[in-house]
UniProtKB/Swiss-Prot annotation:
The keyword Chloroplast does not apply. It comes from Saccharomyces cerevisiae (strain ATCC 204508 / S288c). It is found in: Membrane. The keyword Thylakoid does not apply. GO terms for cellular component: membrane. It is a multi-pass membrane protein. Partially overlaps WHI5. This is Putative uncharacterized protein YOR082C. Residues 1-29 form the signal peptide. The chain crosses the membrane at residues 34-54, 56-76. Keywords: Membrane, Signal, Transmembrane, Transmembrane helix.
Amino acid sequence: MLVVYMCIWVLYLLLFLFLFLFIASPASLRRSQTHILQCLYYFSLLLISGCAFFHQVLCLVLPLFCFVLFCFFYFFRSALEVFASLFPLPFSTRSHETISKSRIIIKAARGII
């Protein structure tokens, strides 16, 4: 997550440098008779606004989504535990209980008990 965040900031920096050093000077836009420079200018503005939107999604929506997902799975697990306590399985899923029951069965089979 930190790597993605740092890559976004590097992309911001490169785009703003490109925008303000090469494209955004009004004199170069007025001198330019071709539409390529203007297209690059508007494309870089669109790219920066898209990166800003992605940054907002990454910083605001993603943590909120993770929190909602965590709450869902936490309560879903609690609901599963309540459901499992209402309808117990015929065998134990806990390893220490299973091991102790198997030891009792082995001892009973040997005739020790």
